[in-house]
Amino acid sequence: MAFQCQRDCYMQEFDSCVVSCVPAELKLENNGRKEKLTGFNVKLKDTILFPEGGGQPDDHGTIGGVPVLRVLRQGPDAVHFVSSALEEGQEVHIKLDWERRFDHMQQHSGQHLITALADTMFGYKTTSWDLGRQRSSIELDTATVKPGEMEALETAVNEKIRAHVPVTVNLLSIDDPAVEKVRSRGLPDDHAGPIRIIDIEGVDANMCCGTHVSNLSHLQVIKILGTEKGKKNKTNLIFIAGNRVLKYAEKSYNIEKSLTVLLKTGADEHVDAVDKLQKTVKRLQKSNLTILREMAVLIAQNFKSKPDRGHFFSLHNKDGDNEFMNIVANEIGFQDTLIFMTVGDEKGAGLFLIAGPENIVTEVGPRVSELLQGKGAGKAGRYQGKANSLVKRAEVEALLKERSYKCTAGDE
């Protein structure tokens, strides 16, 4: 069965009828967090909302004013997930999120065009593709591409766009001999009905369920951003098409303007300016590390030179690191001195180190880790780790100081 969205990819509003509405759950991932939503699966007599398939994401839109959160294909049906129930038999008005749909059409038709010409020009077969949110990728069945090939391919695809090549949809029966001549990666196991062929006149005929432009001129332009190493003996071609190219150009220009202000150089000198800055930063970091190490030694020597230094040492250094803390601890020696050190933001996250008599460190380590909302581990008289909050540093210091006094009193 072909849906209305496949018969007319440019239709943005449509009236249909609710065939069924049943309670359902939808699992979503929002900013890396998994969510489970309760709602309803709705089947319509027909739909202009494309169900996910053929490498193309589903459409967004509304049914009777109710937002559609997901559209999936189940056999010959499109299942729309909505948050509110709709009555069976109810006549409903469907509105399509056209900006999202047209973007998908541009990327998908762009993929067909690139796939066809990469094959005819260089013999590179497409094994899979991915329509991403910001850029798309085509997996080519080749370990490497030769210099100049992607530039030639980009020129060729944009020549076809400027030539206003028509794109048509043909429906063939599964036993039609013409089916054997089209590009295909196979049909879903639950496919029913005629075979849908996307025909780019004189360029390609490809079996596909997705939504496509009616003329290559609607792609506007294709930019091949480059290639990346893919799976074994594969190469990923990265591209953007249509409005994404305009957004990419706008974003790139805004970044260029900002860098010009920050670097105080023209765009042609940005790379050299950043290279010089990186070398300067690397040199300063090396110098800073040397100073920090020397300071650690001096801090330890200063503590050891005090006749009344006692058996407890505590220090916080905002700019230190694990190496800094360990240098101080090693210089002081922790066989008979309990050492507590932290680095980082005093009211935020950081690192901590406890060093001293092994029995004491083993006893207090987990408690210190708990107070600093962190995680640590230790052995041989050291316990160190990451602190998610150093707010209770003073409380930890008091705890360790008291423990060191008890130990000293016990020894005496």
UniProtKB/Swiss-Prot annotation:
It comes from the Eukaryota. Zn(2+) binds at residues 108, 112, 208, 212. GO terms for biological process: regulation of translational fidelity; translation; tRNA aminoacylation. One of its GO terms (molecular function) is metal ion binding. InterPro entries: Alanyl-tRNA_Editing_Enzymes, Thr/Ala-tRNA-synth_IIc_edit, Transl_B-barrel_sf, tRNA_SAD. Belongs to the class-II aminoacyl-tRNA synthetase family. Alax-L subfamily. This is Alanyl-tRNA editing protein Aarsd1. It comes from Danio rerio (Zebrafish). The gene is aarsd1.
